Amino acid sequence: MYTISKARRLGKCFLIIDNMFVVIGFYVVFPLISIYFVEQLGWGAFLVGFALGLRQFIQQGLGIFSGAFADKLGAKPMIVSGLFIRTLGFIIMSVANTPLLLCLSCMLSALGGTLFDPPRTALVIKLVRPWELGRFYSVLMLEDSMCAIIGIVLGTWLLQYNFKLVCFTGAILFFIAGVFNAWRLPAYKISSSHASLLEGIKKVLNNQRFVIYVFTLTGYYILSAQVMLMLPIRIHEVSGQLSYIKWMYIIEAILSLLLIMPITWWSEKYFKLETRLMVGLITMIISLFPIGLVKNLHTLLILISLFYIGSIIAEPARETLGALLTDYKARSSYIGFSKLSLALGGTVGYSGSGWLYDIGKEQNFTQLPWIILSIIGLITLLGLYCQFKYYSFQSLLNNSHNKKRKL
């Protein structure tokens, strides 16, 4: 028992260190793509949004297949190869002077992500007990916020000199992560079943509750995608200065440090997972609606802060609900399939909002994308409410607690 507990502790420490490299490497590059290509080079927001959406669709849309391979081959080869492929994608992005090259670099980044993301997430479910998932996800969110601010501050500083430096820095960080995983990651098997790839996929598709929940979250991810596209563009529009973009992520880091753990502990005690997810989503919708009308930077940052608070409330509950519905016999297949909503949400969120931004700019109607985003959020909220009304996900968590008591 001690050996198992020690393995879990060491595994969680590894996940936290690995997550640091991946998150910093991501945030050094991706939040600045829209600023560099749209604001500095003058490319259309739809074009850049399409490239970002393509990256999201490929990475998350192919997740079910990469997850099935990870169930069969184990986590290590998938994670290591994925990290190195993303390194190559960032190197190509550094010389992207045409839309074709930008799309190619995003596709390679996506391919890398689709290889390493499902098995990394499955390792969390394997190494963390169900009743500890909510708090561990909160720890990861806290780390994500701190690493995001490090990445974006570093990226914006490098962007003053050269976008190539931004991309090379991201590439180096992912290369280090790849070497670290090749060196230290044990050859974990993340599925307890020896079923074929197709059997793993069929197992997921037969779980109707999980499938409906996943696709309903598409709208949630459409809203979340704006952190990488529309929110940075709006801050640059209102402030007129590139340096103010980093304040988005500074605010996120401060709010995460102050609120993630207290909100998680308090809400776990008094509210169901379903309630926490819906309250967080409502907060996000309320914050997004007036953004196109705001002309003052301080007011804009307050609304963005409210958006982050909504995410802080919703995200641990969303992650835990998804994890509770997975089958330990096909963990990566489940995680991979769950990325489909992120794929659809990212594709529509990036390209759709970029297209609406271009139309709104032409028609002098800057509120257009924010109105549509709010409507999408309300539809998503209604879909979640209908699911939660007829089925209590909280019962799954209670079953896990009962197992804990028996142990």
UniProtKB/Swiss-Prot annotation:
By its UniProt entry, which InterPro entries does this protein fall under? MFS, MFS_dom, MFS_trans_sf, MFS_Transporters, Multidrug-R_MdtH
Query: Which compartments does it reside in?
Result: Cell inner membrane
GO-annotated molecular function: transmembrane transporter activity
Q: Which CDD domains match?
A: MFS_MdtH_MDR_like
Q: What is its main location?
A: membrane
Pfam families named in the record: MFS_1
* Listed transmembrane segments: 13-33, 88-108, 139-159, 163-183, 210-230, 247-267, 277-297, 298-318, 340-360, 368-388
Q: Does the keyword rRNA-binding apply?
A: no
SUPFAM superfamilies per record: MFS general substrate transporter (SSF103473)
Any Gene Ontology CC annotation: plasma membrane
**Protein's UniProt keywords contain Transmembrane helix:** yes
- Give the way it sits in the membrane: Multi-pass membrane protein
Alphabetized, the UniProt keywords read: Cell inner membrane, Cell membrane, Membrane, Transmembrane, Transmembrane helix, Transport
The family classification in the record reads: Belongs to the major facilitator superfamily. DHA1 family. MdtH (TC 2.A.1.2.21) subfamily.
* Name this polypeptide is given: Multidrug resistance protein MdtH
Q: Which source organism does the UniProt entry give?
A: Blochmanniella pennsylvanica (strain BPEN)
Q: What is the lineage of its organism?
A: Bacteria, Pseudomonadati, Pseudomonadota, Gammaproteobacteria, Enterobacterales
